[in-house]
C-alpha cells in the first residue's frame, strides 16, 4: 500500500454520500462539495465554492461514498465445494457428504495441503471481485487450518494479500470453527489446544486482532465458546461470534456478556438476545448470502433490531461451503429483498455499522473530518444504484488512506 502524502489534496466537485447520521439528508448526501485530504485522513468537508487553492482533483460531479467494508469473510482456503453443492441439490444430505470426506473437512484438508503461495494465488481473484465493488477494508478469518501451523499460514496469507492489493485488513482468529479430524470425538481437547496454544501464540506474533467462535449445535457449545472468550479476554482481545444461525443457544447473550464486537448470522436471535446486544453495543452482522444459499426460511429479527436500535452490518460471509459470493453489492441487495432492509440501511451496513463491527467506528465507515480517507468514487447518480443492480459496479476509483489504488 502506498504511503499517505503530507500534501493536502482537494477532491472537488463531488456529490458526497457521507453516510454520516449527523446530516439530515438520506445517505448524508451533500451536493457540490469537496473533500480536503492530508496525511491519509479527511481534514475537512467544505462546499465546493469554499474549497481552498492547491493540488486538486476534479471529480466532475461524480458520486463519492465511504469505502465499502466487508466485515465477515472466509477468503483464504484451498479446494472447491462446487460438486458438493450439486450433490446437495440432488438430495444428498450434508451428513452423508461429510461422512464421505466432504463438507468443511474437505476444505480443511485442501487448505492444509496448500502452500502460502498457492493460497495467495487462489485468494487473489476473490479479493479482486470485492475491490471492483469499492471495498477498501475487509475482515478475513482463519478457521480452515485448525492447528497452529496452518492457522498461522492462513493469517500470514491474509496479511500478504492485503499488503499486495491496497486494502485494509482486519484479521480474525477462528480456530474454533470446527473440530479437526485428529480431534474427532474430543472437542473439549481441541478447545484446550486453541486456548492454551494457538490463540496465545498467534496473538504474540501479531497475526490477528479479534477472536471468533462458531457457537452452534454443529459447532461448539456455549460452554466451549466461553472458554475461548475467557482466553481472549485474559489477553485483552475483542471477541465476536457465529451465533443463532441454526438454533437458539443463547450465543448472542454470551457474545454480549463479553462486550463482543458483533453477533453474526443471528437468524434464531430472540428478543432477550437483541436486548443484550443493545446493552453491550454489539453489532448485528447480517449474512444474507448464507441464508439464500442454504435455502433457509428463518430470517433475522430485523424489526426487533430496529426497535432496540441495534446497528445492523451486512457482509458477504464469502466461503466455499455456504456463501460463495464475493460481492458485497449482492449481499446488500439480498439484505433488502430477503431481510427487508432499506437500501439506506444496507449502505449503513457496509460502511459505518461494518466499521463498528470491526471496532473501527471512530475512524472508518463515514466521510467525516478526522476519519481515514478511504472512499469510493462512482459513475452513478445515487447510492441506491449499487444496491438495485448488483453486478454492474460502476466504480471510477478507489482511494485508501488518501491514495488512489
Curated annotation (Swiss-Prot):
Q: Which UniProt keywords apply?
A: Cytoplasm, Histidine metabolism, Hydrolase, Iron, Metal-binding, Zinc
Which cofactors, if any, are listed as required? Zn(2+); Fe(3+)
Name the chemical reaction catalysed here.
Answer: 4-imidazolone-5-propanoate + H2O = N-formimidoyl-L-glutamate
Q: Which residues bind N-formimidoyl-L-glutamate?
A: 144, 319, 321
What's the EC number here?
3.5.2.7
Q: Does the keyword Protease apply?
A: no
Taking the first listed entry, what is the main subcellular location of this protein, grouped into a coarse class? cytoplasm
| InterPro entries reported in the protein's UniProt record | Amidohydro-rel (IPR006680), HutI (IPR005920), Metal-dep_hydrolase_composite (IPR011059), Metal_Hydrolase (IPR032466)
Q: What class of enzyme is it?
A: hydrolase
Q: Which residues bind 4-imidazolone-5-propanoate?
A: 81, 144, 177, 245, 322
| Any GO MF annotation of the entry | iron ion binding
User: For binding Zn(2+), which residues are annotated in this chain's numbering?
Assistant: 72, 74, 242, 317
- Any stretches that span the bilayer, and where are they? none
Which cellular compartments is it found in? Cytoplasm
> Where do the annotations place Fe(3+) binding?
72, 74, 242, 317
The pathway is:
Amino-acid degradation; L-histidine degradation into L-glutamate; N-formimidoyl-L-glutamate from L-histidine: step 3/3
Q: Name its GO BP terms in alphabetical order.
A: L-histidine catabolic process to glutamate and formamide; L-histidine catabolic process to glutamate and formate
Q: Report the HAMAP family cross-referenced here.
A: HutI (MF_00372)
Q: What is the protein's given name? A: Imidazolonepropionase
What organism does the UniProt record list as the source? Klebsiella pneumoniae (strain 342)
Identify the taxonomic lineage of the organism of origin.
Bacteria, Pseudomonadati, Pseudomonadota, Gammaproteobacteria, Enterobacterales
